Amino acid sequence: MADLNSLDVLIQALRRLPGVGVKSASRMAFHLLQHDRPGALALSRALQVAADQMRHCERCHTFTQADICATCLDPRRDASKLCVVETPADQSALERTGAYHGLYFVLMGKLSPLDGIGPKDIGLKGLFDRACDGTVQEVILATNFTAEGEATAHVISEGLKSRGLRLTRLARGVPVGSELEYVDLGTIAHALLDRR
């Protein structure tokens, strides 16, 4: 009975991943246990190490193992531009285009009043402080084109519009209702270059 319980616990843990239901979680669990025990152990160790060592960058809030991430420390980055994204996955998608060379602020979420997520929950005060540090001249709003992403961009825009900063939004080449991490790199690059 203990083995069955352990299997159920594994399946439930895998179901926490986005887009993974009972069938997919079961398939993954059976595969790892039946055909890839070394892979299962490597996955377990990698998850443990990441959970123990990854933290949020003190400047931009992305994931890092240091106090300040490599992007924030890179002197080649254009510190006058600050791109606001919802998640580290969105930041990664923008980075992979090679079209952006400024800095980031990762909200680690989006406003969602129905879910009880407000401005304090996504660190808007920290964003406003960072944007008004005297170095930033342009804030690029790269939140997703969902209802929550649009609301988040609007609140940020309202909070910053009187502070003498140039506010831009990714161009609408990114399909409405999409999430950046799932959009092809060419579309993201054009949207970033054609922002308004």
From Swiss-Prot:
Domain called Toprim: residue spans: 80-175
InterPro entries, per the entry: DNA_Rcmb_RecR, Rcmb_RecR, Rcmb_RecR_Znf, TOPRIM_dom, TOPRIM_RecR
Zinc finger (C4-type): 57-72
Annotated GO MF terms: DNA binding; zinc ion binding
GO BP annotation list: DNA recombination; DNA repair
Protein keywords: DNA damage, DNA recombination, DNA repair, Metal-binding, Zinc, Zinc-finger
Family annotation (HAMAP family): RecR
Family under the similarity heading: Belongs to the RecR family.
Protein's name in the database: Recombination protein RecR
Organism: Albidiferax ferrireducens (strain ATCC BAA-621 / DSM 15236 / T118)
